[in-house]
């Protein structure tokens, strides 16, 4: 049976994040409605997502921020709040709210990398800098935040509606390697290698000259050439990495 979600209006952002968290993460089918009477008369599982709760409603209520009802990309007043033993964003303050923060707005902001579409200072490779991200400020860069919040959401929904069956998740580890340069000295071609040697000579960089020369004569390994070690690890751990 589908969970009925009451919202003030239906937007693409709503579809995206509810599809991700309810359908993909938890395996819960749902449908939206803007009809309060249909929602109130619905006897199955239901959730009201909006600014204010209705006095007469008997389902679950989650107080909403504005971002999922917007269409343009605009500056957000993203505040950090405490949640359990960690942090969250988009705090809400209605006592009837399922969570003390808008779990859907917060998840959308993070999973869409919304902040990267706003003006920011990029690094030398035109990339968004990690220290500017909201997850860095929340000290949660290395945690699967959306997965953890989805689990919390699922637990709350099942506590209220025991007939809900959550999808069992399976995981696999897929390492990725971003290889900007495969070699530091080797396979650069005669012209580039000669120019680099001339540069080292002009700088009187004896250590660099010696190291480069040893690598070119195959007396030392190229410092960037770690592929044999990577392949060894992949075989030992049975990994199937992706290279970029």
Region spans (language model):
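Terminal accessory/targeting
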Residues: 1-244
């Amino acid at each position: 049976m589908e969970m009925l979600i009451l919202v003030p209006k239906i937007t693409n952002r709503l579809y995206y994040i509810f599809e991700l968290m309810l359908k993909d993460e938890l395996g819960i089918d749902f449908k939206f409605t803007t009809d309060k009477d249909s929602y109130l008369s619905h006897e199955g599982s239901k959730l009201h997502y909006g600014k204010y709760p209705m006095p007469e409603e008997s389902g679950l209520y989650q107080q909403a921020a504005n971002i999922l009802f917007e269409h343009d990309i605009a500056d957000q007043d993203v505040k950090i709040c405490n949640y359990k033993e960690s942090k969250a964003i988009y705090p809400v303050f209605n006592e009837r709210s399922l969570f003390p923060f808008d779990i859907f707005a917060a998840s959308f902001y993070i999973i869409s990398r919304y902040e990267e579409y706003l003006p920011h200072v990029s690094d030398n490779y035109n990339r968004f800098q990690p220290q500017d991200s909201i997850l860095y400020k929340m000290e949660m860069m290395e945690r699967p935040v959306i997965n953890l919040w989805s689990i919390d959401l699922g637990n709350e929904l099942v506590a209220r509606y025991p007939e809900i069956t959550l999808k069992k998740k399976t995981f696999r580890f897929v390492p990725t390697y971003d290889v900007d340069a495969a070699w530091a000295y080797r396979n650069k071609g005669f012209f580039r290698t000669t120019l680099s040697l001339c540069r080292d000579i002009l700088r009187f960089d004896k250590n660099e000259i010696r190291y480069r020369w040893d690598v070119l004569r195959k007396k030392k390994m190229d410092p960037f050439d770690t592929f044999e070690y990577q392949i060894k690890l992949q075989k030992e751990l049975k990994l199937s990495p992706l290279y970029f």
